[in-house]
Structure formats: structure tokens, C-alpha cells
């Protein structure tokens, strides 16, 4: 029985940022019912990391530009004979709506940034053990509030990210589905190829080999070296087949 493992690697800084944002939001939304101190620290640590990422660049501007770029790509696809025009028009409408919603939304993350509880916890997370009850009595009392109260507050925090989530999910879905997986073969654990202006590499490996990829490169060229999970006794086959999509 084969167990495929999917690896994704960004080929530019924009995609790297988007994948990090996606990961952090998934972590925040994974367990929205905060019932324990551990649940709270998991949520607030990821919320703080998300705000750090959002503060580093022009996320909204990059997303709007990408939404427009995807619309242009769909426009060119619409001229191809036999293409599903209904699906193309549906996607173009989704892109336009996401762009309008994102442009009209307040500064991304501002609702979280202005929340007093998030700000207090965020300040203490950099201190080892800094979220004890005597350090953060505000969090301690909040965790003793009714569960429904906490659920409502968490839901409002996540809802404030909806314009970002909607646009990002649409963009990443289009990029991920822009290329098919193709069988490739590495020689002595090494593979290289041209990126052809790709934004994202997606690799599928069989878990049975217990190998993982170490990827370097950019949109025009990339290299992949396969390494064994067991660095001492693991073996890399002379010829190793895997699946690759350059998106």
C-alpha cells in the first residue's frame, strides 16, 4: 500500500509569505474552541506570528495584483476552443468579487492588532514561561469565562480575516491546479530543472522510501536533493521516482 506525502516549496518571496499565512490561519482555525491554557497559547502564538508576517510586507497589494493576474490568465483561457466557458466565467466572477471585498476591507489584521487580550498575550510570548497566571491574570480570568463567551470572541477574530482568507484560498487553489503532476526520476538523489516562471513546486513522494526533499532555486531554475530521514543508516536509491508539478 502506497502512502503519498505531499511537499510544497515556494519559488519566490511572495509565495513564501502566502504559504506561511495559510499555515498560520489553518493552525488558528484548527481548534477554535479554546477550553484550556494550552489551547489558548496555541491560538495566540499563531495569531501573533500571523500579525508579524502581515506587518512585514504589502500583503493586500500583492494579493490584489495576483487576483488581477489570474483574471487575465482566465481571459486568455476563455479564447481556447472547447474550454468550459461557464467555469471560466464563474472563476472570473469570484476573482472580481474577492478583489472588491479585499480592497474595501479595513487594514488586514487590524481587528486582531487592536484587541487588548491578543496584545497582552503577544507581549509575553517572547518570554520563556511568560504566560503563567501571575504574568497574565487577564488571560487567566478569560479562561474562566463561559465557553460560549470565548467561542464568540474567537469566531469574531477569525471572521475579521475572511477577506484575506477568501482571496488567499482562491489564489492558491488556482495556482496549485495550474499544473499536473508528472513522473520524474532523480539520479543519486539529485534532480534539477527549469522553473519556467513557476511560483510553486509540489512534490509527491512515497512514504515507504523515508526520503525528504531539500529544495533550492527560484522561478527560472531549481534543484532538489533527496535525503534520508535516518541520516545515519538511511539509503538514497541510485534512481528514485517521484511526482512533480511546477505551478
Swiss-Prot record:
The keyword Cell cycle is annotated on this UniProt entry: yes
One Pfam family per UniProt: ZapD
Record InterPro entries: ZapD (IPR009777), ZapD_C (IPR027462), ZapD_sf (IPR036268)
One GO cellular component term: cytoplasm
Keyword annotations of the record: Cell cycle, Cell division, Cytoplasm, Septation
Biological process, per Gene Ontology: division septum assembly; FtsZ-dependent cytokinesis
Keyword Membrane attached: no
Primary localisation category: cytoplasm
Physiological role: Cell division factor that enhances FtsZ-ring assembly. Directly interacts with FtsZ and promotes bundling of FtsZ protofilaments, with a reduction in FtsZ GTPase activity.
Family: Belongs to the ZapD family.
Protein name from the UniProt record: Cell division protein ZapD
Source organism phylogeny: Bacteria, Pseudomonadati, Pseudomonadota, Gammaproteobacteria, Enterobacterales
Gene encoding the protein: zapD
Amino acid at each position: 500500500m502506497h502512502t503519498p506525502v505531499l511537499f510544497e516549496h515556494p519559488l519566490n518571496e511572495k509565495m513564501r509569505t502566502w504559504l506561511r499565512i495559510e499555515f498560520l490561519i489553518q493552525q488558528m482555525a484548527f481548534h477554535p474552541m479554546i477550553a484550556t491554557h494550552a489551547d489558548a497559547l496555541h491560538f495566540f502564538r499563531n495569531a501573533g506570528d500571523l500579525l508579524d508576517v502581515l506587518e512585514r510586507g504589502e500583503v493586500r497589494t500583492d494579493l490584489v495584483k495576483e487576483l488581477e493576474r489570474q483574471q487575465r490568465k482566465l481571459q486568455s483561457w476563455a479564447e481556447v476552443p472547447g474550454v468550459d466557458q461557464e467555469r471560466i466565467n464563474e472563476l472570473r466572477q469570484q476573482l472580481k468579487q474577492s478583489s472588491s471585498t479585499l480592497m474595501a476591507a479595513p487594514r488586514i489584521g487590524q481587528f486582531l492588532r487592536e484587541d487588548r487580550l491578543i496584545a497582552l498575550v503577544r507581549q509575553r510570548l517572547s518570554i520563556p514561561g511568560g504566560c503563567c497566571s501571575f504574568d497574565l491574570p487577564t488571560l487567566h480570568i478569560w479562561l474562566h469565562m463561559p465557553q460560549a463567551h470565548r467561542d464568540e470572541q474567537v469566531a469574531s477574530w477569525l471572521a475579521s480575516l475572511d477577506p484575506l482568507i477568501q482571496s488567499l484560498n482562491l489564489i492558491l487553489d488556482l495556482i496549485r491546479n495550474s499544473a499536473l503532476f508528472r513522473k520524474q526520476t532523480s539520479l543519486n538523489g539529485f534532480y534539477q530543472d527549469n522553473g519556467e516562471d513557476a511560483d510553486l513546486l509540489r512534490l509527491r513522494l512515497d512514504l515507504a522510501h523515508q526520503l525528504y526533499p531539500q529544495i533550492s532555486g527560484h522561478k527560472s531554475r531549481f534543484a532538489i536533493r533527496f535525503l534520508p530521514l535516518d541520516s545515519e543508516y538511511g539509503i538514497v536509491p541510485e534512481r528514485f521516482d517521484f511526482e512533480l508539478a511546477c505551478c
